[in-house]
Amino acid sequence: MRMPRTPLALAFFTAFALMLSLTVSAVGLSGCQNYDTLVQKDQVAQQKWADIEAQLQRRYDLIPNLVAVVKGSAKHEEDTLAKVTQARAEASSIKLSAEDLEDPAKMAAFQKAQDNLKGSLSRLLVTQEAYPDLKANAAFHDLQIQLEGTENRVSRSREEYNAAVSDFNAELGKIKGSVVNKATGHPFKPRPYFAASAESQVAPKVTF
């Protein structure tokens, strides 16, 4: 036979139920906030990547004009010009989706292609030292300035993207971020960085 609940017991039970409900609600609210934070930081990283793509496209667009100008003055640089054209084609053919940005192997392939293009461009630019007419060419000089500006913006965009990736990965690596990610089916993955290789930062030697 069940004993009747006293007013004190009922009050205790009610208070306990209320506290439990508030706790569950607080946990749920915190989880939603943490999820929203991950989404927001992920979107920032994606936007920063879009900025990189815009600057890389600017680089792609400048190369044909640069090749044409060099071809008109540097008659013996067919191999260098061919390598630049090929490197541009290979780099511009690699398109990364949002999912690809989470794949270290695909990011590495993209990075390698960009490093190869940058190296080819650097070797092309130093050919001016062997061709006075090219060095004095106003169109070449203008394109060189535009390319240098583009490279600076690529570098800055890369730094901003890597900062956003670091921020996102740090949030995902926190206990609350990890718990929320697991509870929602692991929609988020750590992002690899987009950092130029050490080789691509070394200026080519001028040997004529």
Where are the language model's segments positioned?
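A helix-centric hydrophobic-segment signal that preferentially recognizes long
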Residues: 2-208
